[in-house]
């Protein structure tokens, strides 16, 4: 089954989106730290949009501090397989930019982005996309096959 790890601030927008997916999920808490034991797709909100010169990956601030702390645990980082980001289209090129940052830093695919708490179409797209994604992940990769 698709494993989801997500962070949601006090606005609860990301939490509401994840609830609508009706898939197993673990929430990164606001204060405590957690450790995961299975591969997962990370869902997170984007912070700090609206920079005059557009996205600046070196500036920081797009990824919530709680997510940074979670991913700074090498064990947690080793299990991430993809990222989905929430954002606000008012921020133009920075819409969902936390997904770009995590994708680059963790070398995983940026799978999808949605606005605020997502639409019904977003829920269906993510649910179907995760099903396909995990199916592909469970297939042996050429590097995992032994020469006979």
From Swiss-Prot:
Annotated SUPFAM superfamilies: Flavoproteins
Gene3D superfamilies attached to this UniProt entry: 3.40.50.360
UniProt GO BP: protein modification process
Cross-referenced InterPro entries: Flavoprotein-like_sf (IPR029039), RNR_Ib_NrdI_bac (IPR020852), RNR_NrdI (IPR004465)
GO MF terms, alphabetically ordered: FMN binding
Family per record: Belongs to the NrdI family.
Function according to Swiss-Prot or TrEMBL: Probably involved in ribonucleotide reductase function.
Name of the protein in its database record: Protein NrdI
Species this protein is from: Mycolicibacterium gilvum (strain PYR-GCK)
Lineage, top ranks: Bacteria, Bacillati, Actinomycetota, Actinomycetes, Mycobacteriales
């Amino acid at each position: 089954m698709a494993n989801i790890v997500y962070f949601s601030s006090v606005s609860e927008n990301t939490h509401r989106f994840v609830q609508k997916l009706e898939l197993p999920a673990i929430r990164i808490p606001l204060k405590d730290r957690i450790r995961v034991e299975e591969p997962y797709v990370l869902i997170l909100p984007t912070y700090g949009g609206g920079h005059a010169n557009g996205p600046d990956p070196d500036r920081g601030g797009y990824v919530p501090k709680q997510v940074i702390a979670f991913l700074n645990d090498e064990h947690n980082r080793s299990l991430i397989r993809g990222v989905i980001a929430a954002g606000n289209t008012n921020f133009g090129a920075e819409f969902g930019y936390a997904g770009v940052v995590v994708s680059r830093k963790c070398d995983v695919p940026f799978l999808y982005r949605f606005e605020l708490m997502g639409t019904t179409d977003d829920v269906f797209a993510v649910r179907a996309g995760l099903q396909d994604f995990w199916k592909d992940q469970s297939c042996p990769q050429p590097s995992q096959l032994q020469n006979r």
